[in-house]
């Protein structure tokens, strides 16, 4: 038995020697022990070896106790991104295949019938930091935001092809997150034939998705369960879908029996897709009008009152320095919205800004309700659906925050 233990210990030591190690300052391992998947540069005491950006390293205490394996990148503030706390694990092709299979098995359990589009891999929420994969029927759209996934790009792509066998895969790896990791943008077809647009079904409804240039990867998959919730309130209601993008909330409200739905967005391209989405589900844009306008101006100028209002604006805070300005914008738009909701009406309001947490967002909306001279009852907190899992110890991963409110005088 002693020989076996010695052998196991020696094997573990040999495995860990494959990787460089980062040693943490005393006490700075606490967040990792709690399950948070990030370590920041200020937590690092020293580095053993010469790891390059994107390499797998061992995170260890200052007393040399090995804690976890993860991606290392000294170029950015998040210096370590957790992959596993199982020190017997080897980060190889089989590791990524297991991760992809686990993600697929979860989606098979949580995606409703009549739906062929979902978030297939949700970065840290699926143990693959920096990787987003969305499925639109027979096509995949993915983005890579970390140097670690970038180094494993071909292995991950091979795994997706093997496990899913899509007709086409398109890459949209771009934006500030890649810049912070020292990566250049990469956009283009990664496999097969890629038509640019897809027609999907969600809960039996039909939608067109611009996978090449649409926001995010073309469709707000994270709002699916929230659209179902709003639909339940829409019978005989007058609804305003503000920042309507391609009109998915509007289609759900129309199916729910709304007598009037107005969709407001500043993008004509998005509005054109919204018209198609309404018509393909049997709803005329003449009866359910689409307005190209700035939402802030529209809310100030309209005299109409609504039973239901949906506010799903773009991220107002894309960096920490933007928080104060973003808070003012969120308060302004919610104030104008609450003023135009009938007594007993419903407000579904959202923020997708990473730097606006749930507590701050709630305070902003409460201030807007108070300034409007109204009362709000919280019916439900809203967020992404179960195909967007997040690590419970990683609130930063829960970027979409929402409140379902009953508004009264």
Language-model features: locations:
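Conserved SAM-binding motif I beta-strand of class I
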Residues: 260-265
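Mobile active-site "lid"/loop adjacent to the S-adenosyl-L-methionine
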Residues: 306-336
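Conserved SAM-binding loop of SAM-dependent methyltransferases across substrates and taxa
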Residues: 246-258
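Non-catalytic accessory regions of SAM-dependent methyltransferases
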Residues: 3-135
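C-terminal catalytic and target-recognition region of SAM-dependent MTase-like enzymes
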Residues: 346-409
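Conserved class I S-adenosyl-L-methionine
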Residues: 236-245
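Non-catalytic substrate-recognition/targeting regions of SAM-dependent transferases
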Residues: 121-134, 150-220, 228
